[in-house]
């Protein structure tokens, strides 16, 4: 019985993610397009907060350090995700094959400053939590 519920839940999450695939990619491209070097994270933080609100997070706020805190759902279990959204600089722009803030998609991969470290995990966390909180 538990195994079936897990399979059903996994199928529902997969369906939610497939439905929102374009939104997830757009969101990732948008946050990677916002420069956030040297801990200048306010603009990208506001964009992330807006996405959380759009997805139904009941509480979205910033603490005094600039961290984005959000709450979605009201079940008995609590999940905490953590990431950083600042990046290192781009160095010499002439050394890049493309605009590092463009969010270039090629062969199924997104290339942009911060895509791997660490802005890229943020859409998965936010949409994953929204999927888990979604009613079947």
Which residues make up each language-model segment?
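Acidic/histidine-rich catalytic neighborhood of metal-dependent amide-processing enzymes
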Residues: 118-136
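Acidic/His- and Gly-rich active-site-bordering loop/insert found
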Residues: 2-115, 132-136
């Amino acid at each position: 019985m538990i195994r079936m519920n897990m399979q059903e839940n996994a199928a529902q999450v997969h369906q939610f993610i497939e439905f929102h695939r374009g939104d997830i990619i757009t969101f990732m491209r948008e946050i990677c397009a916002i420069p956030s070097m040297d801990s200048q994270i306010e603009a990208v933080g506001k964009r992330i907060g807006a996405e959380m609100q759009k997805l139904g997070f009941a509480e979205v706020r910033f603490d005094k350090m600039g961290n984005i805190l959000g709450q979605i759902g009201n079940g008995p279990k609590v999940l905490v995700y953590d990431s950083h959204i600042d990046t290192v600089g781009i160095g010499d722009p002439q050394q890049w094959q493309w605009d590092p803030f463009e969010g270039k998609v090629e062969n199924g991969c997104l290339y942009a400053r911060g895509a791997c470290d660490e802005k890229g995990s943020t859409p998965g966390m936010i949409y994953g939590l929204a999927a888990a909180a979604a009613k079947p």
